[in-house]
Amino acid sequence: MLTLFIVLFIVLCGVAEPPAQASELPIIKDSPIPDFQNRPQDVTLYDFDAPPQGLFRAITTSEGFDEELGFHRTHEIVPVKPTNRFRPDTPAIFIVFHLHQHYQGFQVFGRCFPEAVAGLDPTVVIGQDAMHIALEDESGYLTLSPPQDAWKPGRYKVEIHVGEQVNEMSLMGTMRFTIAAASEE
């Protein structure tokens, strides 16, 4: 009786039939590498004429900065009155930034050029600053002072470089700010 029950169970469950064979997959020709890797439509070009990205979590121009105790009990630099429009009598313009995690120290450089300022050559550096970033630093700032006693009205750009020295390979991006004429305030 038991053997009859086992035979019926096997027949009803379909175990007695041979397993169905999977159909063979067709053999296809190898695809060329450009069809699936390094495709032009997948690549977005990095814009060096825009605020830096990648290493920088946030970067802004401001009228000042403050130092606070950060989450990991580190010194965190925060912007005070962030803006990109300043008055001609502004004593200094600050570029405050927050960084992603990094595994060695480096320097952040800022080089200021008069992009659209009457009477100033746009190819001549009118101010620069650098800050050494230690391994434990998560934020920092650059200070730009006016070239004379006051800023001339117009638009300025600041090239942000990262590394040990400024060269064509160290450029990370560009920040811009405007000095408003006294009548525009």
For each of these PLM feature ranges, what is it?
Residues 3-12:
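Bacterial N-terminal signal peptides
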Residues 24-153, 159-171, 175-181:
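Contiguous segments within soluble domain cores/interaction surfaces
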